[in-house]
């Protein structure tokens, strides 16, 4: 076994320590009062204890970390392009896409709280070796793809804030250091880490709200855009993009692990229900805030660039320049305000990416090693290819936009491999006990999953029909599509037919 200089092993012996999302000493203690203890017998048969603002505060955190994936640079690029091309007309879709994302994330939280295990761990037990290895590789590829977008977003912001002195590759290296910031903060407890994310989300909110105020969008058009569904052939591609970038595969794995950072007695059914209630409230609040931030970005670009010659050429790389030309400087130049918001989005999403990478690797492989080493490995998987990308494409905006399209495709491909296992697992009484989802919830969840998968399938079909030509490439895409579809059908069929689970969520009635 590899050793450190002080003889502390890098890899943890499997017999010494079982792989878990959080050690008991790392979890946030939920304070119980005496009055509630007196009610334990009564509420144990009937639902959760009375609502408490103090408890809501203690449970607040995982939902906001989860919401970062709704605010990453990839989503911001989707927002600005939707606003520039479609104006206010897709705001209703942004709202409903966020609602669909909320439903998926609540299922992820439900799985984590009811079982005490996260999605990657459960997939390790649910599927045979070959299938779980495919799922692991797919999850890692999705994570690397999103991380490249996030790191490049931060690097673009750093380049703007340094007035071009620091090139993209230097920004990538600086962003890579967030791994060590993350490790430092994690050593001081999960609440400290959550506080940092609260600051980053607040920074995004203030920055983009300031831009919203500067742009002075039409209130009536904004309201109509939210309340009146409207879709045209000209905006269909952007509409598909809005829905496609809302659900991030790694975020589904992440949230099921984050909710285990609170101390919940899974032997008591009402304690589990209490935790689910508070997580539902805080996740809803977090995603409502993310919706507002996305709305700010969309409306700023709708106001400034809709029906202009620049509408189809705006991307993450040149957005700051176009904003500056449109809205000017002033005391606080909008270029730098945009860069500050973009930097907060990039930094927060890269840290959550590192976090998700630890859970994915540890869960699928039952790979028990020191947290700092595992974070370093998962970070390197994304940073090394990103540095190469930044060195090659530093001065090529068009090439970076093409790369971004390919990365979106990469993540779209992975979505079924997070959604289908999640829905299959939360539907099984052998795993969830009394917390399995009911028929109505199950039907709605599968309809949402089917809609998201079909939308992303449309994106893939359109992309490959435009980008791929020649017999060899067409043959390869055909073979890949057949294998891809077969594996999805396998996951669905196994989820319906496979039930030999000895494990069950513990809950007293």
From Swiss-Prot:
GO biological process: defense response to bacterium; iron ion transport; manganese ion transport; positive regulation of reactive oxygen species metabolic process; response to bacterium; response to zinc ion
InterPro entries, per database record: NRAMP_fam
Ranges for region Disordered: 1-25
Gene Ontology MF terms: metal ion transmembrane transporter activity
TM segment ranges: 56-76, 84-104, 133-153, 165-185, 193-213, 239-259, 285-305, 327-347, 383-403, 406-426, 444-464, 472-492
Tissue/organ expression: Expressed in vascular tissues.
Segments of skewed composition (Low complexity): 1-12
Cellular component per GO, a single term: vacuole
Its membrane topology: Multi-pass membrane protein
Keyword field contains Transport: yes
Predominant location category: membrane
Induction pattern: By iron starvation and infection with the bacterial pathogens P.syringae and E.chrysanthemi.
Sequence ranges of Acidic residues compositional bias: 13-23
Gene disruption: observed consequences: No visible phenotype under normal growth condition, but slightly enhanced resistance of root growth in presence of Cd and increased accumulation of Mn and Zn under Fe starvation.
Keywords from the UniProt entry: Ion transport, Iron, Iron transport, Membrane, Transmembrane, Transmembrane helix, Transport, Vacuole
Location(s), subcellular: Vacuole membrane
Similarity comment: Belongs to the NRAMP (TC 2.A.55) family.
NCBIfam families, per database record: nramp, Nramp_1
Function, in words: Vacuolar metal transporter involved in intracellular metal homeostasis. Can transport iron (Fe), manganese (Mn) and cadmium (Cd). Regulates metal accumulation under Fe starvation. Acts redundantly with NRAMP4 to mobilize vacuolar Fe and provide sufficient Fe during seed germination. In association with NRAMP4, required for optimal growth and photosynthesis under Mn deficiency. Exports Mn from vacuoles in leaf mesophyll cells, making Mn available for functional photosystem II in chloroplasts. Involved in basal resistance to the bacterial pathogen E.chrysanthemi.
HAMAP family per the UniProt record, alphabetical: NRAMP
Protein name in UniProt: Metal transporter Nramp3
Source organism per UniProt: Arabidopsis thaliana (Mouse-ear cress)
């Amino acid at each position: 076994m590899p050793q450190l200089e002080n003889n502390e092993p890098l890899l943890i012996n499997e017999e010494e320590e079982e792989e878990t999302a959080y050690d008991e000493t790392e979890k946030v203690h939920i304070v119980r009062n005496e009055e509630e203890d007196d009610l334990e017998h009564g509420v144990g048969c009937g639902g959760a204890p009375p609502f408490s603002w103090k408890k809501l505060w203690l449970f607040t955190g995982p939902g906001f970390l989860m919401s970062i994936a709704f605010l990453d640079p990839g989503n911001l690029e989707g927002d600005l392009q939707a606003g520039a091309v479609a104006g206010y007309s897709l705001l209703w879709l942004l709202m409903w896409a966020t609602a669909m994302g909320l439903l998926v994330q609540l299922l992820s939280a439900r799985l984590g709280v009811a079982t005490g295990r996260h999605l990657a761990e459960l997939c390790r037990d649910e599927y045979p070796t070959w299938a779980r290895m495919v799922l692991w590789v797919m999850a890692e590829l999705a994570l690397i793809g999103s991380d490249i977008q996030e790191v490049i977003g931060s690097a673009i912001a750093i380049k703007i804030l340094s007035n071009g002195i620091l090139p993209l590759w230097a920004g990538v290296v600086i962003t890579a250091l967030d791994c060590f910031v993350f490790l430092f903060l994690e050593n001081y407890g999960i609440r400290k880490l959550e506080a940092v994310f609260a600051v980053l989300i607040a920074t995004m909110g203030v920055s983009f709200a300031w831009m919203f105020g500067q742009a002075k969008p039409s209130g009536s058009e904004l309201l109509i855009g939210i309340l009146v569904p409207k879709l045209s052939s000209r905006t269909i591609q952007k509409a598909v993009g809005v829905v496609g970038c809302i659900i991030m595969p790694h975020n589904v794995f992440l949230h099921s692990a984050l909710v285990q950072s609170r101390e919940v007695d899974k032997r008591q059914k009402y304690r589990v229900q209490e935790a689910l209630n508070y997580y539902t409230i805080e996740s809803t609040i977090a995603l409502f805030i993310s919706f507002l931030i996305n709305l700010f970005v969309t409306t700023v670009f709708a106001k400034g660039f809709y029906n202009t010659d620049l509408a189809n050429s705006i991307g993450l790389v040149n957005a700051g320049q176009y904003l500056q030309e449109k809205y000017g400087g002033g005391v606080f130049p909008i270029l730098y305000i945009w860069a500050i918001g973009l930097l907060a989005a990039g930094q927060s999403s890269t840290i959550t990416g590192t976090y998700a990478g630890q859970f994915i690797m540890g869960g699928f492989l039952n790979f028990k090693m020191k947290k700092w080493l595992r974070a370093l490995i998962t970070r390197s998987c994304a940073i090394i290819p990103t540095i190469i990308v930044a060195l090659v494409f530093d001065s090529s905006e068009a090439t970076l936009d093409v790369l971004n399209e390919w990365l979106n495709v990469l993540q779209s491909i992975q979505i079924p491999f997070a959604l289908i296992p999640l829905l299959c697992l939360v539907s099984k009484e052998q795993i969830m006990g009394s917390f399995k989802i009911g028929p109505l919830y199950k039907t709605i969840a599968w309809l949402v999953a089917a809609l998201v998968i079909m939308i992303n399938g449309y994106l893939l079909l359109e992309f490959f029909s435009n980008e791929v030509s020649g017999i060899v490439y067409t043959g390869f895409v055909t073979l890949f599509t057949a294998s891809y579809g077969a594996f999805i059908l396998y996951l669905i069929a196994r989820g319906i037919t496979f039930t030999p689970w000895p494990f069950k969520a513990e809950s007293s009635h």
